[in-house]
Amino acid sequence: MPRLLIAASGTGGHIFPALSVAEELPESWDISWLGVPERLENQLVPTKYDMTVIPVGGLQSKGLRKYFQLLKLILAIFFVIYLIKRKQIKLVFTTGGYIAAPAIIASKLCGINVILHESNSYPGKVTRLLGKFCDEVALGLPIAAEKLKRCRTIVTGMPVRKSFSLKNPLPIWVPKGLEPLIVVMGGSQGAVGLNRMVRESLPWLLKQGYRVVHITGKYDKPSNINHKNFVEKSFTEEIPGLLQHADLAISRAGAGALSEFAICSLPVILVPYPYSSDHHQDANAAYAAQFGAALIVHEDRLGTHVLTRALENLLATNRMSSKYKSDDLLNKMRIGMTKLAIKDANQRLISILQRYV
């Protein structure tokens, strides 16, 4: 029986790819999960995977706190070594982030294989530092290989949930009508700044008759906007059906969201999170824009004005409820998104894992 330890923690961009792979592995695999206390994985990872949590954080702190974080990392490494031996783990799979550091180091000290998946176009710090110790580094976006020349890289694409490969109905709570449907997504970390920009653009959107679904994230207060063509939710599990029936998205530029838009061939206006580590969301957005798949609007004092103008340019001159014209910008963006998609990413990663057990 193959025994796999998955180390994935923090944001949806780390957790959802790992979950997507885990759910499609053969039932004969014994899967354990390594996470961090009070992080998103404690809510999302099914109970069928034995979850172990350990305190670990980044080393970017200063002063005494940096030494405290280093001590936590050392203790975490020893704990993962103990976990690997106790559970007789044969392979470790990680999606980067803080939890990847003790998982990778412990794996090498125990002499077992470790596979890392890097989703972003600009690799995270742990990937850049420890990727060379991994047996393979699977890439969500090919451009990431430029920063990982000492690593054994392979392009797999970004795994997405199996439900995205199915035809899903439009959620019943979405406003009904033939007018274009615009979906706003802030990502697992929420997006207070993005939400503000969108709310300031809403009067124009609703005046034009467009339908708007706004997924705000849990860290923002609900608005007081009441309109038949507007629905606001902090979270929904019906994202596949929502995106498959949408005409345009407005979103942060996380790698997970980009992969879902690509699978759905959904044009998007990207508003990169300005405080993302190493500005990786800016890099993700720029990569999507190279394919003509996205427009980029930055979150700054002019952001709302620029967002409204972008929406006007995309929507005002053509009604998306009719078929796309070949020369429409939205149609060109849809084609660009299709080129960005790697639809067999899940199977590519599973094939790699199966080679190492």
From Swiss-Prot:
Q: Which UniProt keywords apply?
A: Cell cycle, Cell division, Cell inner membrane, Cell membrane, Cell shape, Cell wall biogenesis/degradation, Glycosyltransferase, Membrane, Peptidoglycan synthesis, Transferase
Gene Ontology molecular function:
UDP-N-acetyl-D-glucosamine:N-acetylmuramoyl-L-alanyl-D-glutamyl-meso-2,6-diaminopimelyl-D-alanyl-D-alanine-diphosphoundecaprenol 4-beta-N-acetylglucosaminlytransferase activity; undecaprenyldiphospho-muramoylpentapeptide beta-N-acetylglucosaminyltransferase activity
Q: Where in the cell is it found?
A: Cell inner membrane
Which EC number applies?
A: 2.4.1.227
SUPFAM superfamilies in alphabetical order: UDP-Glycosyltransferase/glycogen phosphorylase (SSF53756)
Where does the record locate the signal sequence feature? Answer: none
| Superkingdom per UniProt | Bacteria
Q: Locate the residues binding UDP-N-acetyl-alpha-D-glucosamine.
A: 11-13, 120, 161, 188, 281
The protein's annotated catalytic reaction(s) are: di-trans,octa-cis-undecaprenyl diphospho-N-acetyl-alpha-D-muramoyl-L-alanyl-D-glutamyl-meso-2,6-diaminopimeloyl-D-alanyl-D-alanine + UDP-N-acetyl-alpha-D-glucosamine = di-trans,octa-cis-undecaprenyl diphospho-[N-acetyl-alpha-D-glucosaminyl-(1->4)]-N-acetyl-alpha-D-muramoyl-L-alanyl-D-glutamyl-meso-2,6-diaminopimeloyl-D-alanyl-D-alanine + UDP + H(+)
- Annotated pathway, please? Cell wall biogenesis; peptidoglycan biosynthesis
Topology in membrane = Peripheral membrane protein
- What does the entry give for GO biological process? carbohydrate metabolic process; cell division; cell wall organization; lipid glycosylation; peptidoglycan biosynthetic process; regulation of cell shape
- For the protein in the UniProt heading, the enzyme class is transferase
Principal localization reads membrane
Annotated Gene Ontology cellular component terms: plasma membrane
Biological function:
Cell wall formation. Catalyzes the transfer of a GlcNAc subunit on undecaprenyl-pyrophosphoryl-MurNAc-pentapeptide (lipid intermediate I) to form undecaprenyl-pyrophosphoryl-MurNAc-(pentapeptide)GlcNAc (lipid intermediate II).
Family classification: Belongs to the glycosyltransferase 28 family. MurG subfamily.
* PANTHER family linked: GLYCOSYLTRANSFERASE (PTHR21015:SF22), UDP-N-ACETYLGLUCOSAMINE--N-ACETYLMURAMYL-(PENTAPEPTIDE) PYROPHOSPHORYL-UNDECAPRENOL N-ACETYLGLUCOSAMINE TRANSFERASE 1 (PTHR21015)
Protein name, please? UDP-N-acetylglucosamine--N-acetylmuramyl-(pentapeptide) pyrophosphoryl-undecaprenol N-acetylglucosamine transferase
Top-level taxonomy: Bacteria, Bacillati, Cyanobacteriota, Cyanophyceae, Synechococcales
